[in-house]
């Protein structure tokens, strides 16, 4: 996606995306895919490089809305059971040898540690020049069940709001919510309750449209261009089109419905 981003000619008003989670699954392209790095730090660094290109493709008042999940360290020497366990989705064991899932012990991590990938990435992006403006909690009323018995079931993920510059576009009125008595509107708070939704061709839940729409409404105006460098099943494109925005993005995985379609015309693309 880094190379593809360099080819884009138009500036997006905002980027909203959910990158491949660390150690989740194999997309079949070991050379280009993200998420199979040997260490969490390597994974974060690859994403930092992607979002450098994203910044170059944003207007000066543009924003980045980033959803990212976490992982647990799972050291099992000699058993080949893997390095991390996802708390947000089912893991796919068919991962290439490039990914450090063979029980190689990493410095600084203890077995059962929550790695803290969302915040590792957030701080790395801030250090790279992004303004870290807010952490939004995606609360999941229907989280994936977990068999673990020594902690609570994980039922949230983060959405981070970054801005390219100190002053940026944010329409607070566009996402106001009804008051309890229904007589007025109030500002949207930072905990969003949205159900997960499965994707028919994947073994895990994907970015829900109801989670994306408030981000688009707050971060752009009608007719603006929305960027997603990890388009996945195309939910960002669907949400953008429904809100009269244009969209552009790319996707490596052939299994998704977009199947390597790169949307490159900022003029009301055909429905997917």
Residue spans of the language-model regions?
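Single conserved hydrophobic/aromatic residue that forms the stacking wall/gate
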Residues: 261-272
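Core catalytic lobe of class I
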Residues: 1-259
